[in-house]
Amino acid sequence: MQVEIEKEEDGRWIAEVPALRGAMAYGSTKKEAIAKVEALVLRALADKIEHGEEAPEVNHVFTVAA
C-alpha cells in the first residue's frame, strides 16, 4: 500500500493511504506521521479480516511516496 506524505503549511506532516478510505494521520515529523498511518492501516485491515470482510490484496505492506 502506498503512503503519500505531505508537509502542511503549519509545519505538521500528513500521511495518507489512498487505497483505504479515511486512512490518514498527522505527525510533528515525517517519520511520526508515517508510523501513525501505518499503525492505523494495519488495525483497519485486521478489523476487516476479523469481521469476514474482504481486505485489499497486499503484495508489499507499505511504500512511501514523497
Language-model segments: which ranges?
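Short aromatic-glycine-(Arg/Gly/Cys) micro-motifs in beta-strand/loop hairpins
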Residues: 5-20
